[in-house]
């Protein structure tokens, strides 16, 4: 009985995350500004991490946790890089000095 309820809840959460992913991808494509696209990319990566986490629970394995961590690291680095590019027009300084 409990296993059936748990399975139904996991499948319904996958459906809800799938709908959220479709909405995020639509906003990522149609975003009016670059800042909207950056925020949407960050949200999309969070939804993908959630989907992978739910799939990990569904399959009963912890081997997907490494991929969740990799997605989080790539999302963080890309968000910071794009934000720096939007803010100043460059990602890295050529003279190795900080912008103050």
From Swiss-Prot:
Location of the protein in the cell: Cell membrane
GO terms of molecular function: sodium:proton antiporter activity
GO cellular component: plasma membrane
InterPro entries linked to this entry: MrpF/PhaF-like
Ranges annotated as spanning the membrane: 5-25, 38-60, 70-92
Keyword Flavoprotein: no
Membrane-protein topology: Multi-pass membrane protein
One Pfam match: MrpF_PhaF
Alphabetical keyword list: Antiport, Cell membrane, Ion transport, Membrane, Transmembrane, Transmembrane helix, Transport
Primary localization: membrane
Function according to Swiss-Prot or TrEMBL: Expression of the mnh2 operon in E.coli is not able to catalyze Na(+)Li(+)/H(+) antiport. It does however confer higher growth rates than the control strain at up to pH 9.5. The operon may encode an NADH-ubiquinone oxidoreductase.
Oligomer and partners: May form a heterooligomeric complex that consists of seven subunits: mnhA2, mnhB2, mnhC2, mnhD2, mnhE2, mnhF2 and mnhG2.
Family: Belongs to the CPA3 antiporters (TC 2.A.63) subunit F family.
Descriptive protein name: Putative antiporter subunit mnhF2
Native species: Staphylococcus aureus
Taxonomic lineage of the native organism: Bacteria, Bacillati, Bacillota, Bacilli, Bacillales
Encoding gene, per UniProt annotation: mnhF2
């Amino acid at each position: 009985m409990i296993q059936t309820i748990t399975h139904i809840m996991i499948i319904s959460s996958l459906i809800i995350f799938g709908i959220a992913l479709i909405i995020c991808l639509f906003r990522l494509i149609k975003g009016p500004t670059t800042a909207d696209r950056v925020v949407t990319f960050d949200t999309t990566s969070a939804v993908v991490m959630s989907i992978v986490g739910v799939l990990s629970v569904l399959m009963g394995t912890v081997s997907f946790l490494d991929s969740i961590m990799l997605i989080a690291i790539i999302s963080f680095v890309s968000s910071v890089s794009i934000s720096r590019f939007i803010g100043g027009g460059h990602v890295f300084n050529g003279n190795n000095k900080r912008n103050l």
